Design a protein with these regions (language model features):
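Transmembrane helical core of 7TM receptor-like proteins
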Residues: 1-323
Length: 323
């Protein structure tokens, strides 16, 4: 999500073309450019973005409604799915309304505190989604590798504790971001070449040593989402070993099908994230508008796909939806 590969030269070239560039220390507002270089196409770009946003909101609210009204879905996997739906809703609604305001009404100004709030929510709920994927992987691990103890291990109180741990972890790890940003001096520009506030984008505007912030951002990336990826990989290694040890092909396929939805959600979350991270670090010749556009698409793709994946792949949800 973070545009680390955006050079300061590119940022300033866009900034200097805007009349709001000024010298200041404590900005009251930031200017969000939207998709730099594609301003003339903002209205057209907004059409697929608005469509994905509508699908994400409708799909995730549908998941929440179905799980709440169907007693047979009151199980750990579906509780975690509801957490994922809430996370997706907050993640996309924290950025898309402002983004569409930029695209449709050229409303580029954002209050300093509102920018920090948006930054916190975007990063916090992105990390939270990673934690929920880990919790869902643990649920699948217990269900397949130790099925007789699934109901005794993943009780409702345990599910609540796991959910609370996911929320607290993401909240605490991301909390330093807005505090660091608030205490930096800004003296070059208040223009952000993005349609929403990100930690690294705001950090590039500071006239101070931001190495602490940069290193902390890398720490969060590798020690939080990186460890999540390792835990998920270990869980699915054990799951696959258990599946291949089953005596018949039909039993193996039936058991594997219970993991397909979760695997698709993981792939939809981690593969674009990995691609964007590598692109920002190594594809230095890629134009800035493409960097920003891809980052924005990534922000919407998982919230849009997750309810579709579970709606299509999960029989109980599909049957309840078709009633």
């Amino acid at each position: 999500m973070e545009t680390r590969g955006t050079s300061r030269r590119e940022l300033l070239s866009y900034s200097m073309s805007d009349s709001n560039t000024t010298d200041f220390t404590n900005p009251s507002t930031f200017i969000l450019l939207g998709i730099p270089g594609l301003e003339a196409a903002h209205v057209w770009i907004s059409i697929p973005f608005c469509t994905m946003f509508a699908i994400a909101v409708l799909g995730n609210f549908t998941i929440l409604f179905i799980v709440k009204t169907e007693p047979s879905l009151h199980e750990p996997m579906y509780y975690f799915l509801c957490m994922l739906a809430v996370t997706n809703l907050i993640l996309c609604t924290s950025t898309l309304p402002k983004m569409l305001a930029i695209f449709w009404f050229n409303s580029k100004e954002i209050n300093f505190n509102a920018c920090l709030t948006q930054m916190y929510f975007t990063h916090c709920f992105s990390v939270m989604e990673s934690g929920i994927c880990v919790a869902m992987a643990f649920d699948r691990y217990v269900a397949i590798c130790d099925p007789l103890r699934h109901s005794t291990i993943l009780t409702n109180p345990m599910v609540a504790k796991m959910g609370l741990a996911v929320v607290l972890r993401s909240s605490i790890f991301i909390l330093p971001f807005p505090f660091l940003v608030r205490h930096w001096p800004y003296c070059t520009t208040n223009i952000i070449p993005q349609p929403y506030c990100l930690h690294i984008a705001v950090a590039k505007l500071a006239c101070a040593d931001t190495h602490v912030s940069t290193f902390y951002g890398l720490f969060v990336t590798f020690c939080v989402t990186g460890l999540d990826g390792i835990f998920i990989a270990v869980s699915y290694t054990q799951i696959l070993r258990a599946i291949f040890s089953l005596p018949t092909k039909d039993a193996r396929l039936k058991t594997f099908e219970t993991c397909v939805s979760h695997l698709c959600v993981i792939l939809a979350f981690y593969i674009p994230r990995l691609f964007i991270s590598l692109m920002y670090r190594f594809a230095q010749n890629v134009p800035l508008p493409f960097h920003v556009l891809i980052a924005n698409v990534y922000l919407l793709v998982p919230p849009m796909l997750n309810p579709i994946i579970y709606g299509v792949r999960t029989k109980k949800i599909r049957v309840r939806l078709l009633r």
